[in-house]
Amino acid sequence: GDCAINLKPTEDQLAEIAWEVAECGKHFGIDPKVAFLSYSTLGSGKGEDVDKMRNAAAKAKELYPSLPIEGELQFDAAVSPRVARTKCPNSEVAGQANTFIFPDINAGVEDCLYASVLSGAWIC
């Protein structure tokens, strides 16, 4: 899913995007572990945006029970096993996520550009 296509996706759209991105990743040999990203990890923060990502993750889990999904997660909890052990030790995704669902265009584009610059990779 391209975060520039859905500028402010709804919870339902985010759930569908998670499935579509995971299926696409499988074509590239990726065993998807999906993290719905937020400024909160499993209720550590409060707000409308947190609720949106938590609800979207719950919808995706309900619709696609075979897909490993967690949310809402902060990026560090999503990718760092050390942080995940502290923030969400019972998660099957935290600390090993490889498929990221961003809440909107601001978060998605900025994070992709950040990763591109730091890694030297080109992201189309």
Residue ranges and their predicted role:
Residues C3, D104-I105:
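Residues immediately flanking
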Residues L42, I105-G108:
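Short glycine-rich anion-binding loops that position phosphate/pyrophosphate groups of nucleotides
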Residues A78, C88, V109, W122-I123:
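Residue-level signal for pocket-adjacent positions within structured domains
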Residues D31-A35, L67-E70, N98-F100, G108, ...:
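Structural motif
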Residues G1-A35, L42, N55-L63, L113-C124:
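ATP-dependent carboxylate/acyl-activation modules
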Residues C3-L7, Y39-T99:
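Active-site rim loops that border cofactor/substrate pockets in soluble metabolic enzymes
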Residues A94-Q96, F102, E110-L113, W122-C124:
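Ligand-binding clefts of soluble mixed alpha/beta catalytic domains
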